[in-house]
Amino acid sequence: MDMKLQEILEQAVRDEDVSDIFLVAGLPVTMKRNGVQARVEMPFLMPKDIGELVEQIYEEAKRKKTRLENGEDDDFSLSMSRRENFPGGRFRVNVFRQRGSLAAVIRVIRFELPDPGKLGIPEDILALTDDSQGRNNKNGGLVLVT
């Protein structure tokens, strides 16, 4: 199978509901959409396919596979600039071995901040940081919820 990393990443970037991409041997590409994993309609990935995709990831990131070759997991960031038919994007990548084969999880990092209303944050919490509605909130700022 001749699978291109750029095509997979483009599909994830263009769908604003996709947060993660899973590349695991024995399954098709899987994407987490609104918290639910869904398989992409494409052939199942074989270990060779995963190896080729991981190679493309490392080439794109201009990163050596030292940690991976030493038997360790590897975590790093990946930025891809805008190209013809590709909007560009930023990603967090984790490459690891699973059941004797390579696997990867890629988190899509959005350029824009999500809409607080879409996140389901209660209005009372938003009011702590927002002065746009004339609340004269002089102490507005960052609120951490742990």
Label each region the model flagged:
Residues 1-146:
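N-terminal "pre-motor" subdomain/linker immediately upstream of P-loop NTPase catalytic cores
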